[in-house]
Amino acid sequence: DYKNITIIKDFDPSIPDLFIDSYLIENGILNLTKNAKDALLDSKTSNPIIRIVTRISHGEIIDGERNSTVCKISVIDNGPGIQEEIKDSIFFPMITGKDKGTGLGLSITQGIISQHKGNIHFSSEPNRTEFFINIPITNNKELDLKTANG
């Protein structure tokens, strides 16, 4: 339930159509926003905010390969931050900082982003956690859809 959380959508209108599996990418972003929501509600953060930001970037390096154009997606919250003891393993299956979590959401999200030849990383400190997703933009529809669908 997001009713007490301010959601700010800051979308770049210049992003071209992406040849991705939008259902999978949407699920990955939903995993990140759900984690942000849970952290905000569990910590009883006053004035809880989740920001979803999209931007275009040029010349990004993903897995050692320079990409001419990349879609950058960020999910940012003002919650308590990720516990120090799980930061190094947060993308591993069964790792969670929540009492009721399964520890699968971030692992699944990382797999989805990898299928799209992208990457995901984060920075976290008290009052700010940001997950960064980078997905290369390509004009090769057939290759991208084949990769995205396995």
Sequence positions of predicted segments:
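Short alpha-helical Gxxx[C/S/T] motif in the catalytic ATP-binding
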Residues: G105, T109
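Conserved micro-motifs of the catalytic ATP-binding
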Residues: D17-I20, G97
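Short beta-strand/loop element within the Bergerat-fold HATPase_c
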Residues: N47-E60
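Detector for a conserved hydrophobic position within an alpha-helical segment of the HATPase_c
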Residues: I113-S114
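Conserved catalytic submotifs in the C-terminal HATPase_c
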Residues: T6-P16, R55-S57
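Acidic ATP/Mg2+-coordinating residue in the GHKL
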Residues: D77
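Short conserved segment of the HATPase_c
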Residues: S68-V70, I82-M94, A148
